[in-house]
């Protein structure tokens, strides 16, 4: 069903054919009013459409007669019987009348609802639920008739004879569907309970209803009980009717109600599927009954109507349905009654319309529905016409399969053509247009959907010659020549602007699990796995795990799993017969098989064989088993309930939820009943008789699950009672554990906390079963529903190329089909990580949307959809801990709610649900105070804070997935009592502010083993206060200096030792210790012992970069903590707001970045410095920059300080990097980054070099193009350095592997493409941006896109910035292009746009570019004709071009700034490089050097062509080397020749294939040197060879042209002198060419004697042409000095060998003709004009 048409009301205006004249008798039916007239149409609301515009009918009504031609003449007025004589007395009945049921219906209660209505063609019909109740009567003023057509036989009215016939239908909704009663001609022994009813939509007034009498051919008339017509949730229950009762039904009587004008349809039968399809309609209350209406007293005309036309056309429940036409007063005939012929003749009077769609030119937009396009075409153009043709032409192998399927479903003729053939689609459509013109006559309408100018001739012919009405649906770039011939013009972009997206044709693929039991326990797992793999391999199975006597297999889809289950069931696995099931068994099953309780749970293999994994079916199986064995104990009942309702995976839940998602919760609960015990312990519970008795109605309801339409509420009283007494609890797998409101009661899953694993739409690696566990209803109070306020759905992998508005609209439309959407929020449009959060109203709708829309294509990407749990997923205990950590730092442990929320979200990185705070009754209290709420920590929860706060430690292990933990040791002695010099040291008298940090000068290479030795003697810990004393005692003097005297802080220097750290004890004393409380292994990588960067708040990452940038500007990278805030303010010109990072104290913020910042000392005199890890990283970057600035990429250690000064303009100070010697920090850098070598007794630091292979260089060139493509989609063509890798992976769908390009670091790869990418450093942050040249190229492409989207390809200069921001999503910055105004910018883009002054102001216009293809061919000829050096400078190439073609070469005319850029855009043809003189040069690629030889070879042959099987030998003989196609990357000669389509092409088939030189390549230029292969064939000195340059290949040579300019007609004629001995018509034709045929040329010439050969005196200017390829030399008289050639003349080779010339005075004319044209490009006709103006053409095509 197409969206968007459901609100259309076909009865918004009064139907003329339902009205009666005021003076007419009520029993007269006037058929002249059965046809709508223009004057009968009342004004209607703009929301509604005219009836004929609605094409969503069940059958395509092609034979509708004209209202003006087929009025009352065909159907005269027919008197109807007196209605008053048919009224029945009103009799009171009981509230629930008894309705007898037929023997074929299921044994249902007498109150079982019956479905009336039906339709064909998909869902075109409508239906209603009718509950038995009191009978209807009618007191309305209007008349409605009921159709009697083929349908189900009516129930005998014997039980309804005393029914009441009065009712009031004033409550019917205005959009009530059409109704008609259907009966059957043949009497059946067993008649169904009810027939089908269609209700016509009513206007404000309600139609009068009449009694329906007995009909001829029917056993009896039926009274049909109905209920009130409401607009509630529609539903249906379907009758059960055997196949034999359906097929022979024929239409007996029919009144035309719905179709205007009436229709007589052909056919006899209808299909069962159309009648059985559910349809949506209103529900009928049980308070009203349907009256009986008398039809006209006529003879039956048994015309069976086909209700299904096979096209799958769908309609909405509010649209008119299929109606039957009748023939009054005529005898019945089984088939082919005269009325059909009459209707067909009337239909022929309507003008035909044909639609011809060039779908390759005007294609269906990506992700849009072709059905909607076809429907829109029919709605727009088909009114008042009959569809005669609807054809589209395309290559079905190239077109989207979904589009082809939709076109076929819409009965559009899809003609297949070969996409590689030139103009194949255009030729096919033109042929169809001509056939349409020959078949139909005016008046007729032709709708052409194309922009191709090739149709101009046909449109002109159809309009002016045939008188057709032409409607052209075209794109914006349509040619004026095409637009001129259409009567109506419609823009294709506007026509399809608001198309709905295409619905997914198939469900997303999900994996299915299969469980195998009874495996042998005495075999090793590998053998069992191999056996299972062999059994399931042909079904695509994979063994996931084997545990004990069970195993789990995974299959790619449900079908494969079911097929594997059938094949593997009872198979022998090492002596055991295995059991295969979709549902997992309890764990005790394999362990204790002898247990009686477990044995009752085990089902036989036969019962386990085909579980359908559906909630409804599982419920029915469980309830049916309970019904069959009501006497069994509670264990059997509970066991079956638990077992049979198991579902294997998350996808099953999604699939089941999507099936039942359209029903409301009450209906769903009514059909998902389970027999459950009333206690939480299922093993001890005893099922009550009341619960056991629920099984029967549950079984019947679930048995009819296929007959339930959406949103029906039909629960029986027994079920409603059961809802109050039974609790249905669902236990989801780990990924869905956040979605459940109930607590697990299984002893295996005793934990009440929710799983913290993240959601994933595809649980490929999880085998958790989805079990419906029995729970006590009291558990709901302990675990409230986390989705009470709706469910959030996360959408990722969104196409960022679409605008935000369009994305929001598409997501809204997609999710609205699965339930009510509360909101759609899009994340910021940055770094390709555009995401959306869609909030659905309830969990069921969200799960259904996840199942249906996962990998649904929106734009050019398939979105990834998953449920988002948000703050609801946090356990209360974790939330309590997080809340305490925030409030403990607040004054008085209280914070305003808004402030608390802000700090919480910034600190923990996720949203806070305030309602969850109210659940923490034992932790916090929320009080109303003043204008807001206050969150306070309860006194019982205020934990004692450490006096040191959260002191830092660099431990390498962490439980929070971060290597950084804040370690607090137990109490530790403040000093070493053994070595402390101050023996009277007192901890209580020690003032931390008095501690002075010592600075030392030491070698780290020497100091590191000493520290480890010191820790070894001190049992692993040394107090920092006494560390100098202990060191002196162990190793002698310690060189201590004052600050700023070249020393390094001792505390920092200690942390430079690998494996050693400084921690803080609980009493505030810093202690030197090993990281893992033991010495590190000798081979441990020191980097593994360093602290790693924490993964957390991106604000902290930004702050850490700012800290590095600030500290490296300080002397020795040290700053007092008291100076941090003012220095930060001065350095960054902004305040450092601690609260912005989620902290309340500065020390906490500084401690939050321990990977970059180290806090030295204690008390108020603490110092801040960079960690050793940050210093090494900083030094590495500086060293690489220094080395790259050197010409040799290396530096001698002795000259390092001088090189450092030159590079950074400051003196070298090693203490800036936290060490005392250069070698200490150089040794920390990995060998893959720099290397140390010894050269001439000098230590040299250099960058390790590795010669890259040619493949790696080529990949790097391709990588540069990828970078350009990636950055062009970024705002301002720049992005952060750290976002490149994820963005690259997201954009291209592959990883960026540095080794693939021959690098080990990403920065080195970027430095290898300096012409494309620049790396800008903004402090510690690096920014990637395109170079200036690439930026302007990208901007030019944006301007082209922007202007092409505008009308007339122009835009006012004042609107440029606004339109730019609207189109690309970010503002345009002029400073990025070093311009101050738009005018200056347009001057730099003169090759793309131009500025024009018009009346309204300055306008930016898109310039018209010249064809690059023709220029490419011309440049290729120049380069192939150049025989000097292997390369040619760009300037020389330009000069040669201008001198050869006498035309200046302006690259701007082709859309390029320079000729170099133009040549670089042809990478497969030429290579552009810079020579030693820094000149830009160009040369042919290796492939086109081969093409150059091929061109020279073919110039030596007749007609420049050669047989393919002779090519290799000829090439080897010509060039002198064997042809090896693999050298050029191709496997065969034919494939190699196909790789140079600009030079040659291959025609013919089989052994007759010929290699033909392209026409563009045939010219040989005299301005360039000749081919070396032809030097030996040059004439002697007395003779000269002159070659004529040609400008195009279709020109012809005219000999003896004098100075006067002859007419164009004379130039086309070949005029021969009378003394020429050559007879061109008698020369033999080469055997390789087909026989020619002579035919008149249609060229209309001026009045002249075309046969006459004019005799002209020979002039010295006449020349002869030498055919060098045939090695014939024709002398030219000495007096012939000049060669006159028309600019269009071509150098033509002789077709035949010429005999020797006996005299030097004789002149010969040799003619060459290429009879075959290239298929890749349609060339002008190249025909030889003979004396009689005949032309040569081949009879057959090879």
Curated annotation (Swiss-Prot):
Residue spans of biased composition, Low complexity class: 1679-1696
Composition skew (Polar residues), residue ranges: 621-646, 681-691
Positions bearing Phosphotyrosine: 699
Domain HTH OST-type span(s) in chain numbering: 875-949, 1003-1079, 1099-1173, 1175-1250, 1259-1334, 1335-1410, 1411-1485, 1486-1560
Pfam entry (one): RRM_1
GO cellular component terms, semicolon-separated: cytoplasm; Golgi apparatus; intracellular membrane-bounded organelle; membrane; peroxisome
Residues where Phosphoserine is found: 66, 760, 1091, 1093, 1571
Any GO BP annotation: oogenesis
Subunit structure: Interacts with LIMK2.
Role this protein plays: Essential regulator of oogenesis required for female meiotic progression to repress transposable elements and preventing their mobilization, which is essential for the germline integrity. Probably acts via some RNA metabolic process, equivalent to the piRNA system in males, which mediates the repression of transposable elements during meiosis by forming complexes composed of RNAs and governs the methylation and subsequent repression of transposons. Also required to protect from DNA double-strand breaks.
Protein name (database record): Meiosis regulator and mRNA stability factor 1
Organism the protein comes from: Homo sapiens
């Amino acid at each position: 069903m197409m969206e968007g048409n459901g609100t259309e009301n076909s009865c918004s205006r009064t139907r003329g054919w339902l009205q009666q004249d005021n003076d007419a008798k009520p029993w007269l039916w006037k058929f002249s009013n059965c046809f709508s007239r223009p004057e009968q149409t009342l004004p209607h609301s703009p929301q509604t459409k005219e009836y004929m515009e609605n094409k969503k009918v069940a059958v395509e009504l092609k034979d509708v007669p004209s209202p003006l031609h087929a009025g009352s003449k065909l159907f005269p007025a027919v008197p109807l019987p007196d209605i008053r004589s048919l009224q029945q007395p009103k009799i009171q009945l009981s509230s629930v009348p008894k309705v007898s049921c037929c023997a074929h219906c299921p044994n249902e209660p007498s109150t079982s609802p019956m479905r009336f209505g039906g339709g064909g063609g998909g869902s075109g019909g409508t239906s209603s639920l009718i509950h038995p109740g009191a009978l209807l009567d009618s007191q309305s003023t209007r008349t409605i008739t009921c159709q009697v057509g083929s349908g189900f036989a009516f129930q005998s009215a014997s039980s309804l004879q005393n029914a009441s016939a009065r009712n009031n239908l004033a409550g019917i909704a205005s959009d009530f569907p059409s109704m008609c009663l259907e009966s059957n001609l043949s009497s059946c022994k067993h008649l169904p309970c009810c027939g089908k009813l269609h209700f016509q939509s009513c206007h404000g007034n309600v139609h009068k209803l009449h009694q329906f009498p007995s009909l001829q051919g029917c056993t009896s008339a039926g009274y049909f009980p109905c209920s009130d017509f409401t607009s509630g949730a529609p539903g249906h229950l379907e009758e059960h009717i055997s196949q034999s009762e359906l097929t022979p039904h024929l239409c007996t009587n029919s009144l035309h109600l719905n179709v205007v004008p009436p229709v007589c349809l052909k056919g006899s039968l209808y299909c069962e599927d159309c009648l059985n399809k559910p349809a949506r309609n209103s529900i009928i209350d049980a308070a009203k009954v349907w009256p009986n209406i008398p039809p006209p007293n006529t003879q039956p005309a048994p015309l069976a109507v086909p209700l299904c036309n096979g096209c799958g056309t769908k309609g909405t429940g509010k649209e008119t349905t299929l109606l039957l036409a009748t023939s009054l007063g005529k005898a019945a005939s089984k088939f082919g009654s005269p009325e059909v012929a009459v209707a067909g003749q009337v239909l022929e009077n309507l003008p035909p319309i044909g639609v011809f769609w060039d779908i390759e030119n005007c294609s269906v937009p990506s992700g849009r529905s072709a059905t909607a396009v076809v429907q829109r075409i029919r709605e727009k153009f088909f009114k008042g016409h009959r569809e005669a043709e609807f054809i589209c032409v395309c290559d079905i192998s190239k077109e989207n399969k979904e589009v082809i399927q939709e076109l076929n479903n819409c009965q559009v003729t899809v003609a297949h053509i070969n996409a590689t053939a030139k103009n194949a689609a255009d030729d096919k459509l033109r042929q169809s247009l001509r056939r349409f013109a020959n078949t139909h006559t005016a008046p007729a309408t032709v709708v052409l959907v194309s922009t191709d100018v090739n149709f101009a001739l046909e449109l002109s012919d159809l309009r002016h010659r045939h008188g057709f009405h032409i409607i052209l649906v075209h794109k914006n770039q349509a040619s004026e020549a095409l637009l001129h011939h259409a009567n109506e013009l419609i823009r294709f972009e506007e026509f399809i602007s608001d198309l709905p997206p295409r619905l997914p044709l198939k469900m997303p693929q999900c994996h299915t699990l299969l469980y195998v039991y009874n495996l042998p326990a005495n075999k090793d797992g590998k053998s069992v796995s191999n056996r299972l793999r062999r059994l399931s391999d042909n079904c695509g199975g994979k063994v996931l795990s084997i545990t004990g006597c069970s195993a789990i297999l995974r299959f790619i889809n449900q079908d494969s799993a079911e097929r594997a289950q059938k094949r593997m069931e009872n198979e022998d696995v090492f002596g055991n017969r295995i059991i295969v099931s979709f549902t997992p068994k309890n764990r005790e099953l394999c362990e204790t098989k002898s247990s009686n309780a477990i044995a009752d749970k085990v089902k036989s293999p036969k019962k386990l064989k085909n579980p359908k994994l559906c909630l409804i079916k599982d419920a029915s199986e469980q309830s049916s088993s309970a019904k069959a064995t009501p006497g069994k104990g509670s264990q059997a009942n509970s066991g079956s309930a638990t077992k049979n309702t198991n579902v294997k995976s998350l996808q099953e839940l999604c699939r089941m939820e999507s099936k039942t998602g359209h029903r409301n919760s009450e209906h769903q609960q009514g059909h998902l009943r389970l027999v459950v015990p009333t206690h939480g312990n299922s093993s001890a519970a005893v099922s009550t008789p009341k619960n056991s008795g629920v099984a029967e109605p549950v079984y019947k309801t679930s048995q009819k699950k296929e007959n339930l339409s959406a949103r029906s509420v039909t629960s029986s009283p027994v079920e409603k009672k059961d809802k109050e007494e039974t609790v249905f609890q669902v236990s989801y797998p780990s990924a869905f554990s956040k979605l459940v409101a109930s607590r697990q009661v299984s002893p295996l899953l005793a934990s009440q906390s929710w799983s913290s694993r993240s959601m994933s739409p595809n649980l490929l690696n999880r085998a958790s079963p989805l079990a419906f566990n029995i729970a006590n209803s009291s558990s709901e109070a302990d675990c409230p529903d986390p989705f009470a306020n709706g469910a959030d759905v996360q959408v990722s992998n969104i196409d960022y190329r679409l605008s935000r508005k369009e994305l929001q609209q598409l997501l809204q439309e997609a999710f609205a089909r699965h339930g009510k959407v509360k909101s759609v929020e899009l994340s910021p449009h940055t770094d390709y990580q555009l995401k959306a959060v869609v909030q659905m109203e309830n969990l069921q709708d969200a799960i259904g949307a996840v199942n249906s829309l996962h990998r649904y294509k929106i734009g050019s990407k398939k979105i990834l959809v998953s449920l988002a749990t948000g703050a609801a997923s946090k356990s209360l205990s974790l939330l309590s801990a997080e809340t305490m950590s925030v409030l403990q730092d607040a004054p008085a442990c209280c914070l305003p709610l808004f402030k608390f929320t802000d700090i919480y979200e910034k600190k923990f990185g996720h949203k806070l649900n305030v309602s969850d705070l109210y659940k923490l009754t034992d932790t916090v209290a929320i009080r109303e105070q003043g204008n807001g709420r206050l969150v306070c920590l309860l006194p019982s929860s205020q934990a004692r804070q450490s006096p040191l706060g959260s002191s830092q430690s660099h431990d390498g292990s962490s439980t929070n997935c971060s290597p950084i933990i804040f370690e607090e040791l137990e109490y530790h002695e403040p000093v070493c009592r053994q070595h402390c010099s101050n023996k009277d040291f007192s901890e209580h008298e020690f003032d931390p502010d008095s501690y002075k940090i010592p600075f030392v000068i030491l070698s780290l290479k020497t100091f590191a083993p000493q520290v480890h030795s010191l820790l070894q003697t001190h049992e692993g810990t040394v107090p920092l206060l006494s560390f100098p004393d202990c060191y002196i005692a162990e190793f002698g003097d310690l060189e201590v200096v004052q600050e700023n005297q070249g020393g390094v802080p001792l505390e920092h220097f200690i942390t430079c030792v690998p494996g050693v750290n400084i921690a803080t004890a609980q009493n505030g004393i810093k202690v030197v210790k090993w990281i893992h409380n033991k010495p590190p292994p000798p081979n441990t990588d020191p980097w593994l012992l360093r602290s790693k960067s924490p993964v957390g708040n991106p604000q902290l990452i930004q702050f850490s970069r700012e800290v590095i940038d600030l500290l490296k500007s300080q002397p020795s990278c040290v700053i007092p903590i008291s100076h941090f805030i003012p220095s930060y303010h001065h350095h960054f010109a902004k305040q450092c707001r601690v609260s912005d990072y989620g902290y309340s104290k500065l020390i906490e913020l500084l401690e939050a970045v321990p990977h970059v910042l180290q806090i030295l000392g204690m008390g108020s005199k603490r110092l801040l410095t960079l960690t050793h890890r940050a210093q090494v990283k900083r030094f590495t970057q500086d060293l690489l920059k220094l080395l790259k600035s050197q010409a040799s990429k290396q530096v001698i250690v002795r000259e390092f300080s001088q090189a450092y000064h030159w590079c950074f303009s400051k003196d070298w100070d090693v203490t800036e990097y936290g060490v005392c010697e250069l070698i200490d920090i150089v040794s920390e850098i990995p060998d893959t980054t720099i290397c140390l070598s010894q050269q001439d007794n000098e230590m040299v630091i250099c960058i390790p070099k590795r010669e890259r292979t040619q493949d790696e260089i080529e990949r790097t060139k391709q990588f540069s193009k990828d970078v350009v493509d990636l950055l062009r989609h970024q705002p301002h063509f720049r992005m952060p350095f750290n976002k490149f890798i994820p963005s690259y992976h997201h954009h291209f769908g592959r990883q960026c592997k540095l080794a693939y390009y021959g690098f080990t670091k990403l920065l080195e790869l970027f430095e290898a493409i300096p012409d494309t990418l620049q790396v800008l450093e903004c402090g510690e942050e690096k920014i990637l941006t395109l170079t200036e040249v690439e930026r302007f190229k990208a901007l030019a492409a944006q301007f082209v896109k922007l202007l092409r989207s505008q009308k007339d390809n122009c835009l006012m200069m004042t609107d440029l910035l606004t339109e730019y921001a609207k189109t690309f999503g970010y503002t345009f910055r002029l400073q990025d292009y070093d311009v101050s105004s738009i005018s200056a910018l347009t001057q730099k883009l003169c090759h793309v746009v131009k500025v024009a002054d018009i009346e309204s102001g300055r306008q930016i216009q898109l310039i018209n570019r010249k064809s690059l293809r023709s220029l490419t061919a011309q440049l290729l000829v120049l380069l192939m004709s150049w025989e000097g050096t292997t390369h040619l400078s760009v300037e020389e190439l330009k000069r040669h071009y201008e001198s050869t073609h006498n035309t200046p070469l302006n690259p701007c005319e082709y859309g390029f700034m320079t000729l170099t850029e133009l040549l670089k855009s042809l990478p497969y043809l030429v290579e552009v490089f810079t020579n030693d003189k820094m000149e830009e040069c160009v040369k042919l690629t290796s492939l086109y050097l081969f093409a150059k030889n091929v061109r020279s070879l073919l110039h030596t042959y007749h007609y420049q062509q050669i047989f393919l099987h002779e090519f290799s030998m000829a090439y080897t003989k010509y060039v002198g080397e064997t042809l090896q196609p693999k050298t050029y990357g191709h496997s065969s000669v034919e494939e190699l020749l196909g790789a140079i389509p600009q030079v040659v092409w291959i025609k013919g088939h089989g052994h007759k294939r010929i290699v033909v030189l392209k026409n563009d390549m045939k010219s040989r230029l005299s301005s360039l040197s000749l081919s070396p292969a032809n030097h030996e064939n040059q004439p002697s000195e007395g003779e000269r060879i002159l070659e004529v340059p040609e400008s195009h290949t279709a020109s012809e040579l005219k000999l003896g042209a004098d100075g006067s300019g002859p007419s164009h007609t004379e130039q086309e004629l070949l005029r021969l002198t009378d003394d020429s001995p050559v007879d061109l018509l008698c020369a033999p034709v080469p055997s390789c060419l087909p026989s020619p045929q002579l035919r008149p040329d249609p060229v209309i010439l001026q009045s002249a004697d075309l046969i006459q050969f004019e005799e002209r005196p020979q002039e010295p200017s006449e020349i002869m042409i030498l055919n060098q390829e045939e090695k014939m030399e024709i002398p030219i008289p000495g007096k012939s000095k000049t060669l006159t050639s028309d600019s269009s003349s071509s150098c033509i080779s002789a077709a035949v060998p010429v005999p020797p010339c006996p005299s030097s005075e004789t002149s010969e004319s040799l003619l060459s003709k290429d009879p075959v044209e290239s298929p890749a490009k349609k060339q002008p006709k190249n025909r030889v004009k003979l004396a009689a103006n005949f032309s040569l053409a081949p009879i057959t095509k090879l």
